[in-house]
Design a protein with these regions (language model features):
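Short helix/loop capping segments that flank catalytic or ligand/cofactor-binding pockets
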Residues: 9, 36-37, 111-114
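Class I SAM-dependent methyltransferase SAM-binding "motif I" and its flanking Rossmann-like core
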Residues: 34, 38, 52-53
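Structural motif
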Residues: 23-27, 66, 74-77, 100-102, ...
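Short, basic, glycine/proline-bearing loop/turn elements
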Residues: 1-2, 70-78, 165-171
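Flexible, low-complexity linker and terminal segments
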Residues: 109-186
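Thiamine diphosphate
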Residues: 1-35, 86-89
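ATP/pyrophosphate-binding catalytic subdomain of soluble kinases
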Residues: 73-128
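Conserved thiamine diphosphate
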Residues: 42-94
Length: 186
């Protein structure tokens, strides 16, 4: 879907698809503009941005990724269409994900929103694209299960040969007590 539909006329469907945790991948081609109306700002365009004709955007943007997180989406990512190394693992991860997956892909409109005063232009995004973390695709492996008693710990071997230590809290522990929970994990 485009950002125009997802953040404007189709925002109701977008919100309820997330709320219902529909098992799907929702790609948004986010260019901050309505191409069919020759450069009108979409609801995702940044406040400080100008259009091709030099007009200021007067409205705060709708951030589809933040909205998806707030609504409980279980897989949310944003990437730049010009960064294959980042985008491909995100797409693979979204396809493998069970539940609602949103990929907000900043994809400059080279006809109506690719100029120096646009925060969604190719050059602006290329120069300001900062990965929050390294993404990689982890293929599905055989499920690792274990069983151990309350109050004990166990070391579990992972698929890559590394180990993880797990500790099961005592059955009398109250996880609803924030103070005790924080003390326990410190």
């Amino acid at each position: 879907s485009g950002d125009g539909d997802s953040a404007s006329i189709g925002i109701g469907q977008f919100i309820h698809a997330i709320r219902r945790q529909i098992n799907m991948v929702y790609f948004v081609e986010n260019n901050g503009t309505y191409g069919l109306t020759k450069g009108q700002f979409s609801a995702t365009n940044d406040l400080e941005s100008k259009n091709k004709y030099g007009e200021d955007n007067l409205f705060k943007p709708i951030d589809l990724a933040s909205m998806a997180i707030q609504l409980g989406a279980s897989y949310v990512a944003r990437s730049f269409s010009g960064d294959r190394d980042q985008l491909i693992p995100l797409i693979k991860g979204a396809i493998q994900h069970k539940g609602f997956a949103l990929l907000d892909i900043i994809s400059p409109c080279v006809t109506f929103n690719n100029h120096d005063t646009s925060t969604k232009s190719y050059d602006y995004i290329r120069n300001h694209n900062e990965a929050v973390g390294k993404t990689d695709f982890v293929p599905l492996g055989e499920e690792i299960t274990t069983s151990y008693k309350s109050g004990s710990s166990i070391e579990v071997n992972l698929h890559d040969g590394s180990k993880i230590a797990l500790e099961k809290v005592n059955s009398k522990f109250d996880p609803t007590n924030p103070g005790k929970s924080l003390s326990y994990i410190r």
